[in-house]
Swiss-Prot record:
Positions of the UniProt region annotated as RNA-binding: 75-114
Native organism taxonomy: Viruses, Riboviria, Pararnavirae, Artverviricota, Revtraviricetes
Region (Interaction with host APOBEC3F): 14-17, 74-79
Naturally occurring in which organism (per UniProt): Human immunodeficiency virus type 1 group M subtype B (isolate MN)
Entries under InterPro entries matching the protein: Vif
Residue ranges, compositional bias (Basic residues): 176-186
Function: Counteracts the innate antiviral activity of host APOBEC3F and APOBEC3G by promoting their ubiquitination and degradation. Acts as a substrate recognition component of an E3 ubiquitin-protein ligase complex: mechanistically, Vif hijacks a host cullin-5-RING E3 ubiquitin-protein ligase complex (ECS complex) and the transcription coactivator CBFB/CBF-beta to form an active E3 ubiquitin-protein ligase complex that targets APOBEC3G and APOBEC3F for polyubiquitination, leading to their degradation by the proteasome.
Single Gene Ontology BP annotation: viral life cycle
Protein name per the record: Virion infectivity factor
Span(s) of short sequence motif BC-box-like motif: 144-153
Post-translational modification: Processed in virion by the viral protease.
Residues with the Phosphoserine modification: S165
Length: 192
């Protein structure tokens, strides 16, 4: 019998960024109570030796499962120390992997009532519409003109600590091009 392998997309992530994300998730689950219904599975509750933690986020009858890994093969850079994140959308027996942008967008659509395309219809029907969104990571594009006008009028309040973003968790902070000053004034160029 031949080996049967299953391939998963695992986003390389910084160890400290994973620790920060886990502590934000736990804070909002147990202290601020903004993450109701979420389930956190510790590494010792998993049978897989590489799983560091799992966070299950319910989305109606489906759920988003964010799994963090440790002890993976290191990447081509020195700082890729074998830490990673996989993001799955599960509904009954079906599961598929999603990217961090889509994961944040799904969380935003399910949990946060903010000013969006449907807000004008809600306002006409007499429902209360709030132009402030607590989870800005769920917006992956520039909003309509009405949204921009309302956000210019109302200053958003900062939430401390911020709600955990999946995109921020998987963001590669080392491979961003470094901005350096050019030799003429304050013009910036991409450094190497």
């Amino acid at each position: 019998m031949e080996n049967r392998r299953q391939v998963m997309i695992v986003w390389q992530a910084d160890r400290m960024r994973i620790r920060t994300w886990k502590s934000l998730v736990k804070h909002h689950m147990y202290i601020s109570k903004k993450a109701k219904g979420r389930f956190y599975r510790h590494h010792y509750e998993s049978t897989h030796p590489r799983i560091s933690s799992e966070v299950h986020i319910p989305l109606g009858d489906a759920r988003l499962v964010i799994t963090t890994y440790w002890g993976l093969h290191t990447g081509e850079r020195d700082w890729h120390l074998g830490q990673g994140v996989s993001i799955e959308w599960r509904k009954k027996r079906y599961s598929t992997q999603v990217d961090p942008d889509l994961a944040d967008h799904l969380i935003h659509l399910h949990y946060f009532d903010c000013f969006s395309d449907s807000a004008i219809r809600k306002a006409i029907l007499g429902h209360r519409v709030s132009p402030i969104c607590e989870f800005q990571a769920g917006h992956n594009k520039v909003g309509p003109l009405q949204y921009l006008a309302l956000t210019a009028l109302i200053t958003p309040k900062k939430i401390k600590p911020p709600l955990p973003s999946v995109k921020k968790l998987t963001e590669d902070r080392w491979n961003k091009p470094q901005k350096t000053k050019g030799h003429r004034g304050s013009h910036t160029i991409n450094g190497h």
